[in-house]
Amino acid sequence: IAADVFEHVQDTYKFLKKLKDKGDFFLFNIPLEISLLSMIRKKNIFKHSFENVGHLHFYTKRTALLTLENIGFKILNCNLVNNRFEEFKKNKKLHSLIINIPQYILEKLGKDLACSIFGGYSLVVLAK
């Protein structure tokens, strides 16, 4: 299990190649911080993530899966998890709910689209 790990590692490819030799099945949780909203908002999410949580690399669903596939992992299953809704469930602040209504509506049309526009998701990947 590598949950929220390889975005912190300087040489992601080297790390993942070594990891691949250590087992048969792998479960990854990868934060997806690149979105349309993250590119246009005034607050620099990339600087914030680097300074506060130490992320050296940033991913979309596609780039995360390509990274794993390029190393030689076979993707068995993947699922998008909306971290913002989980955060709202914890603190239940009204402004948090209101801000997330457009994302919630768009998610009903498709998680991939909502993730690409709003961000705030993680990708859970089962690989071999």
Show which residues each predicted segment covers:
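Conserved SAM-binding loop
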Residues: 1-40, 58-68, 73, 119-128
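A near-ubiquitous, low-amplitude feature marking generic local secondary-structure context
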Residues: 2, 47-51, 109-110
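Acceptor/aglycone-binding surface of glycosyltransferases and processive sugar-polymer synthases
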Residues: 37-43, 49-50
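A C-terminal cap/extension of S-adenosyl-L-methionine-dependent methyltransferases
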Residues: 41-45, 77-128
